[in-house]
Regions:
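A short, structured surface patch at a secondary-structure boundary
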Residues: 24-93, 175, 192-195
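Structured C-terminal subdomain patch of bacterial secreted/periplasmic proteins
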Residues: 24-25, 116-117, 121-124, 133, ...
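Positively charged n-region of N-terminal signal peptides that target proteins for export
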Residues: 1-4
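Short helices/loops that flank or line small-molecule/ion binding pockets
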Residues: 73-80, 99-100, 206-215
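N-terminal signal peptide c-region/cleavage motif recognized by signal peptidases
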Residues: 13-18
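Flexible loop/hinge segments that line or gate small-molecule binding clefts
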Residues: 55, 94, 98-125
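Basic- and aromatic-lined ligand-binding clefts that recognize polyanionic substrates
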Residues: 24-37, 131-190
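His/Asp/Glu-enriched short active-site or ligand-binding loop at hydrolase and phosphoryl-transfer sites
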Residues: 50, 177-203, 223, 249
C-alpha cells in the first residue's frame, strides 16, 4: 500500500494536464484508431501508438506503448496524453487510465457503422467535425454502391482470411473472420454469406478436406498493403486447390486492409 501511494504521488504532477479532455496530445491504442486520427487531420497531435501502427508512415516514427495485448499503462502515462483513444476491447486498460485521471475515448471498429461513429465521436471531441463528416459521407457512398450492386442468387459463400502465421502455406495457421468481425458487415452489404458462422478464429491447420467442406465460392485475403507481388503470391498459394469453387472460378480477391476507407 505504501509503495502504491508513493507511485501515485510521483504521478500526480503528470496527471494535471489530463483533466481537461483536450486533444493536444493523443495516444492511440490500435492501428485502426491511428488511421482514423490521421484521416481527420489529427496526426500532428498523436504522440504515441502501438507497435502495430504502420499506416501512415509517419506513425511508425512515434513512441510505442506496446502491442494489442501487452500495452504499458506506464508508457502511456509517460507520454502525458490529454486523450487516449481506445477500442472497446481495451476496457481494462481504459479503466486503469481513467483511474489515474487520464481522459479516454472508446470507439467500436468491429462494424462499418462503428467506424463511421468513431469519426463522428472524434470530430465532436476534437473540433474536426468538418473533416469527420467528409469521411463519413465517403464511407456512406461506398456502402450505397455495395448495397445496390447486382446480387447473386443464391448468394455466394466467402472465406475471409485476415492474417496468416505461415506465409508459405494457404491452410496453416490462418486467421479467419467470423460473424463477430468487421468483414461480416461488409459481406452483408454485398449479399454474400460468410462460410465461418462462428466467431473470428485462428485455424492452426485447415486440412484440404476441411477446406473442401467449407466450399467457398470466394476467398478474400486481407493483406497489409496493396502489392502486386503479394497478390500473385496469395493466388499461387490457393492454386494448389483447384477443387475449390473459388479457385476454379478465379474468385481469389486480395485486398489492402484499408480498402474500406480509401
Amino acid at each position: 500500500m505504501i509503495r502504491l501511494f508513493a507511485v501515485i504521488i510521483v504521478l500526480l504532477p503528470r496527471l494535471v494536464w489530463a483533466s481537461d479532455g483536450s486533444c493536444e496530445r493523443i495516444v492511440s491504442l490500435a492501428p485502426s484508431v491511428t488511421e482514423v486520427l490521421y484521416d481527420v487531420d489529427l496526426g500532428e497531435r498523436v504522440v504515441g501508438v502501438t507497435r502495430y501502427c504502420r499506416y501512415p508512415e509517419a506513425a511508425q516514427k512515434l513512441p510505442k506503448i506496446g502491442g494489442f495485448y501487452d500495452m504499458s499503462v506506464e508508457s502511456i502515462v509517460a507520454l502525458k496524453p490529454t486523450l487516449v483513444v481506445a477500442l472497446a476491447e481495451h476496457e481494462s486498460v481504459r479503466r486503469s487510465l481513467e483511474n489515474l485521471g487520464v481522459s479516454t475515448l472508446a470507439v467500436d471498429h468491429t462494424t462499418p457503422k462503428g467506424i463511421k461513429e468513431s469519426f463522428q465521436k472524434l470530430g465532436a471531441r476534437c473540433g474536426v467535425e468538418t473533416e469527420a463528416a467528409a469521411r463519413v459521407e465517403a464511407l456512406e457512398r461506398r456502402e450505397a454502391a455495395l448495397r445496390f450492386a447486382d446480387r447473386v442468387v443464391p448468394p455466394l459463400r466467402a472465406l475471409v482470411v485476415v492474417g496468416r502465421a505461415n506465409e508459405g502455406s494457404p491452410t496453416s495457421s490462418i486467421y479467419v473472420s467470423g460473424n463477430d468481425g468487421f468483414y461480416s458487415g461488409i459481406l452483408e452489404l454485398l449479399g454474400v454469406l460468410n462460410v465461418n458462422n462462428d466467431a473470428t478464429m485462428t485455424l492452426p491447420t485447415l486440412s484440404p478436406e476441411g477446406l473442401l467442406a467449407l466450399k467457398p465460392d470466394v476467398i478474400l485475403e486481407v493483406v497489409g498493403k496493396d502489392d502486386p507481388a503479394v497478390t500473385t503470391d496469395r493466388k499461387q498459394l490457393w492454386a494448389r486447390y483447384p477443387q475449390l469453387p473459388a479457385v476454379r472460378n478465379n474468385r481469389i480477391l486480395v485486398v489492402d486492409y484499408r480498402f474500406w476507407v480509401e
